[in-house]
């Protein structure tokens, strides 16, 4: 018989463990977790809320349903310290997911270094990713406590994407009023700028007014536009006629009369 025919027969001799119940004992008790000896290759970490129906003591024995057996590798990895570290990381991940789903989505951390497309941020033992577009200011504060908000979490690859909110000096975690929340989220600099804007009176730079000719050059510029409107009185018309004639004769003497013939024609017609 070939290997492909013998292999399924060999596996069929083993009883499948998934879905079955075995007798277990507690090895170690801690604040929120229990180290359980299943009699298999490795012990299993259980949380207290999973074992509420059974009294949690060192002498307790109970039936435990197998879902997934996790192998750590070499026997050295079965020491309690690596197991504690892994359990703590699981508890921290649960707390971070609670913060991410809550209304007050704020976490403290600091920027480690720059990576491709952004920065690496250390948050509670996890390394999160901060894109450059979500950085609050151009100046990067390395190894300083900053406030971040969690945008996305992927438990399969332990990926966390964050956004920078501000520095760690302001108490962002204290309950605030609705009109104060926006200023605190944006940071201390923007709040200071808004207070300065309220206290200062902004003056208008531009004031629109009618143009009044005051010099000879401005008077000549207005006369090129043509005669005055008909609303003026006869005395004003006479003064304008005399002034335009005098200006035309002066310009003719200077050799610029050809370009200003239309002014003389207008004065003759009037």
Swiss-Prot record:
A single GO cellular-component term on record: ribonucleoprotein complex
Keywords, sorted A to Z: Mitochondrion, Ribonucleoprotein, Ribosomal protein
Location in or out of the cell: Mitochondrion
Region described as Disordered: 218-250
Intrachain disulfide bonds: none
Domain of life: Eukaryota
Entries under InterPro entries matching the protein: Ribosomal_protein_S1-like
Family assignment from sequence similarity: Belongs to the bacterial ribosomal protein bS1 family.
Protein name: Small ribosomal subunit protein bS1m
Organism for this UniProt entry: Marchantia polymorpha
